[in-house]
Amino acid sequence: MKLFKYILFFVCLQINLHAVAENVPTAIQDSLKVLYPSVQTVGWSTDQDYYVAGFQHNGFDMKVWFNNKGNWVMKQTDWQVMDEVPEAVYHTFTFGPYSTDEVLDVTLVEFPKRKSQVVVHLEEDNAETEYQLFYLTDGELINARNVTNLNQILGANTFL
């Protein structure tokens, strides 16, 4: 019975993703091709009033949010580990109060008209408390939010 539920879930998900992909305006698809001409395989979804393109680029998972006019409003690159973060962010994190905690994920978030951010998702050492730390690329920690019992998705609700 569980297997049937999983199969049904994935079939419904595929139908939904296919329906979203068919309804993405041409202007938005063209904008993605201008930004990332080499990307071939794209999964489309929606987040509030935005179309979201998900794909692999240079070995990283990426997502780009587009408004209805075809302008990108947010890009996310899933770095997963601290190896890619700017030196200033690494320094602030390493000498900060969360340095002994386990890093679960690291995401670069870029915007066309405001400063980029690096979000470090971590779990406190010897606890089940999870945080998202929001850094500017110059190393300034601008927010530390407890996400233990919250939706941890970095989407339109978080940034737009």
Q: Where on the chain are the PLM-derived regions?
A:
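Bacterial Sec-dependent N-terminal signal peptides
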Residues: 1-24, 32
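Interaction-mediating elements
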Residues: 21-160
